[in-house]
């Protein structure tokens, strides 16, 4: 499965890319304009067409997991270690070691992850593509990836760029004396830029906060083009107190608590140096996206001095945090807490800090005859002046082993957060311990049910008296919590019965509780007293109940079809479920169930596409699922919006037939906001009510084209079979075990 993400709009994404290349209106003669240019309200379906298999040069049958298993990872590590200390004239290594440079590369590749929508992160290696490859915060990382190209070239398809960059960061840390927590492979590469909403700012370094100072969801970085926060302070203002607030919010939205945040900053700034030999405005050229073809994808050409080595310009800040920047030491914390720091400026004019009693004790990165004072960023000083961070920093300084473990675990979390559950990890270096942020699942201590058991359980479920629509709603609620951006959620674990999911309004908690109570009774009756070692999980029963109800609805439509079912799910415990971490998965809108909370900044139709994108659905799959779920009466709150059938509970194509019926005229309801009334054109009699999500399948030209297929007289069976296929896909989205068989 390819990671699927969504843009706020295609134009927003294009605008970001254009920041490096010039105005979006500057275009070659004859270049086409997107429909959104002329009609901004046009529903953008491009997120459902991202990362299709046709874009992958390895082809649809390529299995990265199998390719990775053939990799001699120790040989790769050896090659990385050699590269670390083999300085290249075209981009010399600071202190003769590229380790700190590669740590920054890995950190910035993974550090785009954000919890609210699961987008960003190391997976896909999006740092290679616009806009990330041209963000100000990623300046000169184009050279880091070029330094790694010989290794990528050598091992080819057996290691992705995403895995190689993270592994290189690990090896860099280890080569400089730090013990990492482990490494898991499995990051498949993307082959095109993501359409991700990174902020509304019209230019890089724009403030991502609104006029009230609130950081917009789902963003995490405080300024456009930064991974986290501005190292000089908010908007370049060297205020450590305000910087601490920015750090806490930005890192928190990237899944890090205070201890993890401090460990990451202190650990990362133990190594390397910042580069600000001269003014970027006077010396540095355009980012890679704006450079000419002769630059071959490289940017930030520096015309001052040699343009590299001692003359390197990256952030504009200049100097190192310790006197030994290529070995792991406790010097960062010792220096931060042991000195009084005063504000100064770098040679490039950037705000930074130096000891009040500054002495030239730091070796130059390229000239051993020179020494420099220590330096700190405003964001470093923030860790000293903020009471909570300062307390942690002092504890870490006094207990180095505690700091080492905290940094190791935080680094592992940073670089693996978007990889999903541990079942997706590859390789021999995967830590054996389960971590709560991995959404751990228990190991089944029983045999999985077989075909005869499945048939028996279906009969028991259908004979239980549970409403079929409630079985379908519960199964959908459980499985559709999945999001393909960071592979979280889904039916496996049956977390729909646990906090916080058991209280989500979109799921109709009271109705779900009744279904679960009945299913638990069936589970107990099946499992009790068995001598054959077989057991059924509630997670399997939830999905099986929905599938049995779908089969029943298909029979009512005249089609005897079996919904594919793969047993093997297990039941998680509350102790294995981090309530705060799972809370961000709660939908504020789900067009598949005609659910939409007030306060959303985006339209119901846009959020339907967003939800479909997270479920890794295509346009036809999204379309058939909406039509089928309406026919099955599966709306939240038993709403009749969009139930365009006189036979609810029958898996028919009537939603599409009646939506496209020209004898019905649609108008906004005069009494209910967000509701439309479909009336007989001749008599004015009310036939149906619908939401904007329902009507978009008739108003959007692209969706209407698909809806017409399913509304056709010859499409009854196709509709049923396509619905079952899409339903099964959603039920199995988190079954990573099935994809490895």
From Swiss-Prot:
Transmembrane segments: none
PTM annotation, UniProt: Formation of the three residue Trp-Tyr-Met cross-link is important for the catalase, but not the peroxidase activity of the enzyme.
CC per GO annotation: cytosol
GO annotation, biological process: cellular response to hydrogen peroxide; hydrogen peroxide catabolic process
Keyword check for Hydrolase: no
Xref: InterPro entries: Catalase_peroxidase (IPR000763), Haem_peroxidase (IPR002016), Haem_peroxidase_sf (IPR010255), Peroxidases_AS (IPR019794), Peroxidases_heam-ligand_BS (IPR019793)
Cofactor note: Binds 1 heme b (iron(II)-protoporphyrin IX) group per dimer.
Cofactor: heme b
Xref: Gene3D superfamilies: 1.10.520.10, Peroxidase, domain 2 (1.10.420.10)
Reaction(s) catalysed (UniProt annotation): H2O2 + AH2 = A + 2 H2O; 2 H2O2 = O2 + 2 H2O
SUPFAM superfamilies in alphabetical order: Heme-dependent peroxidases
Quaternary structure, from the entry: Homodimer or homotetramer.
Protein name: Catalase-peroxidase 2
Originating organism: Burkholderia vietnamiensis (strain G4 / LMG 22486)
């Amino acid at each position: 499965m390819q990671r699927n993400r969504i843009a706020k709009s295609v134009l927003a994404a294009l605008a970001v890319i254009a920041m490096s290349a010039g105005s979006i209106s500057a275009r070659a003669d004859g270049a086409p304009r997107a429909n959104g240019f002329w009609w901004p309200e046009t529903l953008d379906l491009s997120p459902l067409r991202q990362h299709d298999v046709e874009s992958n040069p390895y082809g649809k049958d390529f299995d990265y997991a199998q390719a990775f298993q053939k990799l001699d990872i120790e040989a790769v590590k050896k090659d990385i270690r050699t590269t670390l200390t083999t300085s290249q004239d075209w981009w010399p290594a600071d202190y003769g070691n590229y380790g700190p440079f590669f740590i920054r590369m890995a950190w910035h590749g993974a550090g785009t992850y954000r919890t609210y929508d699961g987008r960003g992160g190391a997976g896909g290696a999006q740092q290679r593509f616009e806009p990330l490859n041209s963000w100000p915060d990623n300046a000169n990382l184009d050279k880091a990836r070029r330094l790694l190209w010989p290794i990528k070239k050598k091992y080819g398809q057996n290691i992705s760029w995403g895995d190689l960059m993270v592994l290189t960061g690990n090896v860099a840390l280890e080569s400089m004396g730090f013990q990492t927590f482990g490494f898991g492979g499995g990051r498949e590469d993307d082959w095109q830029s993501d359409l991700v909403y990174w902020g509304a700012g019209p230019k890089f370094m724009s403030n991502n906060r609104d006029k009230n100072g609130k950081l917009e969801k789902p963003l995490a970085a405080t300024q456009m083009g930064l991974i986290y926060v501005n190292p000089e302070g908010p908007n370049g203002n060297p205020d450590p107190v305000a910087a601490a607030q920015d750090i806490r919010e930005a890192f928190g939205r990237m899944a890090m608590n205070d201890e993890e945040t401090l460990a990451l900053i202190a650990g990362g700034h133990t190594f390397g140096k910042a580069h600000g030999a001269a003014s970027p405005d006077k010396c540095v050229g355009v980012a890679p996206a704006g450079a000419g073809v002769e630059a071959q994808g490289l940017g930030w050409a520096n015309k001052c001095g040699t343009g590299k080595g001692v003359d390197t310009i990256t952030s504009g800040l200049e100097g190192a945090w310790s006197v030994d920047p290529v070995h792991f030491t406790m010097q960062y914390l010792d220096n931060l807490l042991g000195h009084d720091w005063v504000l100064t400026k770098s040679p490039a004019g950037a705000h930074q800090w130096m000891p009040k009693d500054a002495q030239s004790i730091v070796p130059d990165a390229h000239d051993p005859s020179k020494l420099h004072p220590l330096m700190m960023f405003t964001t470093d000083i923030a860790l000293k002046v903020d009471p909570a961070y300062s307390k942690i920093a002092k504890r870490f300084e006094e207990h180095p082993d505690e700091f080492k473990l905290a940094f190791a675990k935080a680094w592992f979390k940073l670089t693996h957060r978007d990889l999903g559950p541990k079942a997706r990890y590859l390789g021999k270096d995967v830590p054996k311990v389960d971590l709560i942020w991995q959404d751990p699942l228990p190991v089944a201590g029983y045999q999985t049910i077989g075909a005869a058991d499945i048939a028996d359980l279906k009969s028991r479920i259908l004979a239980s008296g549970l409403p079929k629509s409630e079985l379908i709603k519960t199964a959908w609620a459980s499985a559709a919590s999945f999001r393909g951006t960071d592979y979280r959620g889904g039916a496996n674990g049956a977390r729909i019965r646990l906090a916080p999911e058991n209280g989500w309004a979109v799921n109709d908690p009271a109705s779900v509780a009744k279904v679960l109570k009945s299913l638990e009774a069936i589970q107990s009756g099946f499992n009790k007293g068995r001598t054959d070692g077989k057991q059924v999980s509630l997670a399997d029963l939830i999905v099986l109940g929905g599938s049995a109800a779908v089969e029943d609805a298909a029979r009512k439509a005249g089609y005897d079809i079996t919904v594919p079912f793969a047993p093997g799910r297990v039941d998680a415990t509350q102790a294995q479920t981090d309530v705060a971490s799972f809370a961000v998965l709660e939908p504020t809108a789900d067009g598949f169930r005609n659910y939409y909370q007030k306060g959303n900044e985006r339209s119901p139709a846009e959020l339907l596409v967003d939800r479909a994108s997270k479920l890794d659905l295509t346009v036809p799959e999204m379309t058939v699922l909406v039509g089928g779920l309406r026919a099955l009466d599966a709306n939240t709150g038993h709403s009749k919006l969009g139930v365009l059938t006189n036979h609810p509970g029958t898996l028919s194509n009537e939603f599409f037939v009646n939506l496209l019926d020209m004898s019905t005229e649609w108008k906004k309801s005069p009494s209910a906001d967000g509701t439309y009334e479909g009336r007989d054109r001749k008599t004015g009699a009310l036939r149906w009510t619908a939401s904007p999500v329902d009507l978009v399948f008739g108003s959007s030209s692209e969706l209407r084209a698909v809806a017409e297929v399913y509304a056709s007289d010859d499409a009854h069976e196709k509709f049923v079979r396509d619905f079952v296929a899409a339903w099964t896909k959603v039920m199995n989205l988190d079954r990573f075990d099935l994809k490895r068989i």
